[in-house]
Amino acid sequence: GKDDLRERLKEITGQKESYDVLYDPVGADLFEPALRSIRWNGRALVIGFAGGDDKIPRVPMNLPLLKGCAIVGVFWGSFRVRESKEELANFQQLFEWFNNGDIDPLVSDVYPLEEAAVALRKLMNRQAVGKIVLTTE
């Protein structure tokens, strides 16, 4: 639950205010307690609402004021169109990190292209954990 998250973050980091950046692609009930654990001048990146439209969090507006933090919407589709040079540079950096082994994305499932419908159904039912990869081999 909400209190468990804050306690777990304190346990992991040894600090009440645990991190500078909150990356949240899910939304839902844990956004507010996660925001309460952000450091002064932190940034909360709202990536999406994988938790579903009915789980879009509501945040007391005094919370960003008290934390001195920014809540930033990150919409990749618009960023890609409006800032294409930066988007290309970001992808080049990500692939460099990947090729060097600096990042290791979680791949939960691999399907042949012929089973794309199965993979898509898993995504639509919110059953995917990590990435799903389709292969052509």
Each model region followed by its residue ranges:
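Residues in well-ordered alpha-helical elements
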Residues: 3, 32, 62, 114-117
